[in-house]
Regions:
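Conserved core architecture of multi-subunit DNA-directed RNA polymerases
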Residues: 1-234
């Protein structure tokens, strides 16, 4: 069977990978931050081994702090008529122009650190929590072409699958009840997995109830964190 979670939660085994993917793509339009006008990026996406390709693309993109949206056609107008110049049409990046945060991981949470420039004072850093739901939304919108470029397989390894939305539950024969005194005749008690599943179901019910009743933000967040904890320790 399975448990449908009220809110997505991070998978403790994949949270580092999710963090890296979030450093590669724009948090607003889900485009890869680098494009083919960058020779480093071109070299990176021409790597045959997908794992290595992911690593190289990540190294190029993690330095970028803006999703570029300028049109490159205008820049090359003067060079068009230079003798012997080949007319190469560069496709614009077509991003959204938003600034990109630095992604930080703290245990089972991801945080986005933005640099905010205020009119009077120096730059200051603002940290926003990236909920699993937000991350899931960003990862879900990545295009097939971008997935191929960053070395993920869209049939078998879509990035949004690294975030748990539905939790598989093993059937009872896999988690039989255990004898308390070791003789097999005395008191019988539920298996650890069954207890943990009970915790997850209760935490999930609390989150559902908080959403249904429109509870205050901080209460709903506490319940979500509890659900995240129980799923991670399952």
């Amino acid at each position: 069977g399975h448990i449908e979670l009220a809110k997505p939660v991070y998978h403790p085994g994949f949270i580092k990978k999710v963090k890296k993917v979030l450093e590669i793509v724009c948090h607003n339009c889900s485009k890869v931050l680098a494009d083919e006008s960058d020779p480093e990026f071109v070299t990176a996406i021409n790597t045959r081994d997908p794992k290595l390709r992911f690593k190289r693309v990540w190294a190029v993109c993690k330095k970028k702090r803006k999703c570029e949206n300028e049109d490159r056609q205008d820049k090359n107008k003067d060079e068009e008529f230079a003798p012997g110049a080949k007319n190469v049409v560069l496709e614009g990046h077509g991003g959204c122009g938003n600034m990109q945060p630095q992604v930080r991981q703290a245990a089972l949470q991801l945080k986005a650190a933005f640099e905010v420039t205020s009119e009077e004072g120096p730059k200051r850093k603002e940290t926003v929590n990236i909920s699993a739901e937000m991350a899931h939304g960003i990862l879900r919108r990545i295009s097939e072409r971008d997935l191929h470029n960053i070395g993920l397989n869209s049939d078998y390894a879509r990035p949004e699958w690294m975030i748990i939305t539905v939790l598989p539950v093993p059937p009872p024969p896999v988690r039989p009840s255990i004898s308390m005194d070791g003789t097999g005749t005395g008191m019988r008690n539920e298996d650890d997995l069954t207890y943990k599943l009970g915790d997850i179901i209760r935490a999930n019910g609390n989150v559902k109830q908080a959403i249904r009743e429109g509870s205050p933000q901080h209460i709903a967040r506490d319940f979500e964190e509890l659900l995240q904890y129980h799923v991670a320790t399952y």
